[in-house]
């Protein structure tokens, strides 16, 4: 197993159980990794096999060498999970803003339905793309609240005006009119 594989395992949370601080250990484990790899390479050079006792001592020595490591904030931890796994494992980015934004709209994306009047939808941008149609181009932003995903068509003028705010993995709140999509059967 190489260093890059260990980085992915740490970022995904797969090694949380190996540390006394659980999920709070990811930053410490990542900081520790170069020393651990160097130490393992040195051991490999010195001897062909280690006893179980020596491995425990090695782990303890390495952990004692790590000092002043800041615990990752929830957002950083979730983004590291997504980077290594392709999805959020221990939660969702939307959970970090859900309570705070319920004052404006408590509507979950799974409960939206076509209505003549617009209403506020909120979530995390999971993807965005430009699609060419017979009528021209349309900008599509996919919003995810951890329970459902919806695609929002954004007019070119609005997309260009707010393009600096429409970033992947960022929270967005959009006043939108929900219509049925006869082509895909969705909304």
Residue ranges and their predicted role:
Residues 19, 92-187:
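Single-stranded nucleic-acid-binding OB-fold domains
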Residues 1-114, 177-179:
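Sliding clamp-binding short linear motifs
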């Amino acid at each position: 197993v190489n260093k890059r594989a260990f980085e992915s395992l740490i970022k995904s949370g797969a090694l949380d159980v190996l540390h006394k601080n659980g999920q709070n250990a990811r930053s410490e484990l990542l900081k520790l990794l170069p020393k651990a790899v160097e130490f393992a390479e040195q051991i490999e050079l010195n001897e062909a096999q280690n006893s179980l006792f020596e491995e425990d001592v090695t782990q303890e020595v390495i952990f004692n060498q790590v000092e002043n490591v800041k615990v990752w904030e929830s957002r950083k931890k979730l983004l590291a999970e997504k980077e290594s796994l392709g999805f959020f494992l221990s939660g969702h980015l939307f959970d970090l803003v859900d309570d705070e934004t319920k004052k404006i709209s408590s509507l979950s994306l799974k409960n939206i339905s076509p209505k003549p009047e617009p209403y506020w939808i909120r979530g995390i941008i999971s993807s965005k793309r430009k699609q060419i149609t017979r009528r021209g181009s349309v900008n599509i932003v996919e919003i995810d609240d951890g329970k459902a995903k919806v695609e929002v068509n954004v007019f070119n003028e609005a997309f260009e005006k707010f393009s600096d705010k429409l970033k992947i993995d960022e929270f967005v709140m959009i006043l939108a009119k929900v219509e049925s999509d006869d082509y895909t059967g969705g909304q």
